[in-house]
Amino acid sequence: MGSAVTSDHSAKGGATALMPYDEVLRGYEPVLGLETHVELGTRSKMFCSCATTFGAEPNTQVCPVCLALPGALPVVNSAAVESAIRLGLALNCSIAEWCRFARKNYFYPDMPKNYQISQYDEPLCYDGYLDVTVDTPEGPREFRIGIERVHMEEDTGKTSHVGGADGRIHGAEYSTVDYNRAGIPLLEIVTKPIEDAGEWAPQVARAYVRELRDLIRALGISDVRMEEGSLRCDVNVSLKPRGSTEWGTRTETKNVNSLRSIERAVRHEIERQGGVLSAGGRVVQETRHFQESTGTTVAGRSKEEAQDYRYFPDPDLVPVAPDREWVEQLRATLPELPSAKRRRLKAEWNLTDKELQDLVNANAVDLVEQTVAAGAPPAEARKWWLNDLSRRATETGVELSELPITPAQVARVVELVAEGSLTNKLARQVVDGVLAGEGEPDEVVEARGLRVVSDDAALGAIVDQAIANNADAAEKVRNGKIAAVGALVGAVMRETKGQADAGRARQLILERLGVSG
């Protein structure tokens, strides 16, 4: 489990090689902290009525509030508060009886007010947990990740640096700022220190963010698309000497944008910090950036402490005091959460952990479940959504759930195959027709003339012609070379353009040749 040697710089100023992962673990225990930002799927921003449509023309979804023009006052989006409470409940958090917003002061071009409205010492949700499972050689192992807090805040604008390396400001010719994103509602979920992950620290970090993503998706409060920035993760890593009660200095790797990258970033930081310490250096508290191309982190700026932001209560916003009856109503409306659904479906459908996770990763659990409810066997429903339909969704750039085909229609296609009316090849053509808006599966079958030729009289005539046209293959079959029947079946399928029942065609061929197969 060693690592290629790379170099970085320690506090002593020299280049430092990475320390092999296993060697680091012999002397140190990794301590993790994960801060996850989730863009909520509300129709308007956190403190104004501007739209939140992703991909709109730059600076077209802005107003005096999100541009911080003098005299513009914020108003809290109640839908965002509701989403925050629902997530807090799903994460087993306590919901504060009283919370308030604070100003987080810093200067950066993407923050027009020169402060961000956030929550500091009085968050809306606190003291929860999320259970995650990691596959190990000894079998699945469960970890309970403590949740320190879930708090509300507003997003920043988006800065783009043109002409620099890797989109960084260094060497850029110029920079642009799009304020469409400024003010979009964010939830920040902060874990308690994760000290018991040990050698599985990278996998635990990945499993936590994956489970959190699935949970948020089930709640329907965000699309949690990491590639679009609606789910962003900051990874804090430090090393604690084995047997010590004192933590080491932590680094924060910002905005890691995929599950795989989260795992790689944690592993690299453990190896990098181990190398720094083994060389006699000290780890610098700083912000770092993950480089996807190399799988490494690079130094950014020194890491601020809370006092650097000069938090103080926002005088323009009144405190939020969620009504207890409202909170309980929200608790009662929570959907079946992913962990409970996985346990149920795994037992009902007899799935392996990998098969189940494939469904989760494709966001296909609900679609498959609805297809099964419409009458399809679980294995067939899973096959269609994960294979053919997933490919079509990828080709058209949409989510599976956005494809113009319903679970009931998929179930009908499966039924037509099972009853022998369609082959798998013909079934794919039927699905193409449904996706093209040609109607229900049965209507597509009739309009395209796709039903399997299974009538013995019609099929028998085609079989006789195939035998006559392929005398050599027929003779081989008569002489006991049963494999040669494939050529005759192929001839039948070509003649019928794939619409023959291949199994029945094979049976008729063998009968006519006087061979048992």
UniProtKB/Swiss-Prot annotation:
EC number: 6.3.5.-
Catalytic function, reaction form: L-glutamyl-tRNA(Gln) + L-glutamine + ATP + H2O = L-glutaminyl-tRNA(Gln) + L-glutamate + ADP + phosphate + H(+); L-aspartyl-tRNA(Asn) + L-glutamine + ATP + H2O = L-asparaginyl-tRNA(Asn) + L-glutamate + ADP + phosphate + 2 H(+)
GO molecular function: asparaginyl-tRNA synthase (glutamine-hydrolyzing) activity; ATP binding; glutaminyl-tRNA synthase (glutamine-hydrolyzing) activity
A biological process term (GO) from this entry: translation
Keyword Zinc attributed: no
InterPro entries according to UniProt: Asn/Gln-tRNA_amidoTrfase_suB/E (IPR017959), Asn/Gln-tRNA_Trfase_suB/E_cat (IPR006075), Asn/Gln_amidotransferase (IPR018027), Asn/Gln_tRNA_amidoTrase-B-like (IPR003789), GatB (IPR004413), GatB_Yqey_C_2 (IPR023168), Gln-tRNA_amidoTrfase_suB_CS (IPR017958), Gln_synth/guanido_kin_cat_dom (IPR014746)
Gene3D superfamilies: 1.10.10.410
Source domain of life: Bacteria
One Pfam family linked to the record: GatB_N
Keywords in alphabetical order: ATP-binding, Ligase, Nucleotide-binding, Protein biosynthesis
Described purpose of this protein according to its UniProt entry: Allows the formation of correctly charged Asn-tRNA(Asn) or Gln-tRNA(Gln) through the transamidation of misacylated Asp-tRNA(Asn) or Glu-tRNA(Gln) in organisms which lack either or both of asparaginyl-tRNA or glutaminyl-tRNA synthetases. The reaction takes place in the presence of glutamine and ATP through an activated phospho-Asp-tRNA(Asn) or phospho-Glu-tRNA(Gln).
PANTHER family: GLUTAMYL-TRNA GLN AMIDOTRANSFERASE SUBUNIT B MITOCHONDRIAL AND PROKARYOTIC PET112-RELATED, GLUTAMYL-TRNA(GLN) AMIDOTRANSFERASE SUBUNIT B, MITOCHONDRIAL
Subunit structure, as described in the record: Heterotrimer of A, B and C subunits.
Family under the similarity heading: Belongs to the GatB/GatE family. GatB subfamily.
UniProt name for this protein: Aspartyl/glutamyl-tRNA(Asn/Gln) amidotransferase subunit B
